[in-house]
Regions:
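Short, charged/polar micro-motifs that form catalytic or ligand-binding hotspots
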Residues: 78, 94, 122-125
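Helix-turn-helix DNA-binding module
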Residues: 110-127
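N-terminal interaction/assembly modules
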Residues: 1-91, 144-166
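Short amphipathic alpha-helical surface patches that mediate protein-protein
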Residues: 105-109, 122, 133
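Short amphipathic alpha helix immediately N-terminal
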Residues: 94-113
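DNA major-groove recognition helices of helix-turn-helix
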Residues: 88, 124, 128-146
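Amphipathic, well-packed alpha-helical segments that form the structural scaffold of globular domains
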Residues: 89, 93-97, 118
Length: 166
């Protein structure tokens, strides 16, 4: 993904102290990089979509017919909700280290609050929330820059939901 102000300003947090809501911040040599609030917003939009897909998972999902462009013009069938759930889970598992993965599983997947997570993992509140922010930044960047199809996780499935949240 090409990171510039026009891509990041729509999902940046207005009250961010680093970017002031612009979505980009200056680092060494005057280079602009996306702010961490943008990555956290991307993760939260993906996570909200994940929760919606899981909540609707008890019902039979619809099968989508997709056209594959090319010589033969084939068609494929897919289940978008199940694919999104699988992509979200597998990408998260692949990107996080053991400690972050444990917190991710307890807090995001199982829904434990911060008090229960801190008690179970024997960590203090500050360490827990710093790790949560680090997880959101790391996975937000990963979901936005996912190759070969970053649009699979972010653009078509999450961006409309992100605009509705913001």
């Amino acid at each position: 993904m090409q990171w510039n102000r026009s891509n990041t300003i729509g999902i940046a947090k207005n009250s961010c102290t680093y970017c002031s809501g612009n979505g980009t911040r200056l680092v060494r040599n005057g280079k602009e990089v996306p702010c961490n609030c943008v990555f956290r917003a991307i993760f939260r939009a993906c996570y909200n979509r994940f929760r919606d897909c899981v909540a609707k998972g008890t019902h039979t999902s619809t099968v989508t017919l997709e056209l594959c462009y090319g010589r033969e013009g084939r068609r494929t069938y897919s289940r978008k909700r199940e694919e999104f759930i699988a992509d979200f889970s597998l990408v998260s598992r692949r990107e996080l280290d053991e400690f972050e993965s444990k917190i991710f599983r307890f807090h995001f997947l199982l829904g434990a609050d911060w008090k229960l997570c801190c008690r179970q993992m024997r960590i203090d509140r500050g360490t827990f929330f710093h790790t949560i922010y680090r997880i959101e930044q790391k996975l937000g960047r990963t979901f936005a820059e996912l190759r070969p199809y970053p649009s699979l996780m972010f653009r078509f499935r999450v961006l409309p939901a992100a605009k509705a949240i913001l």
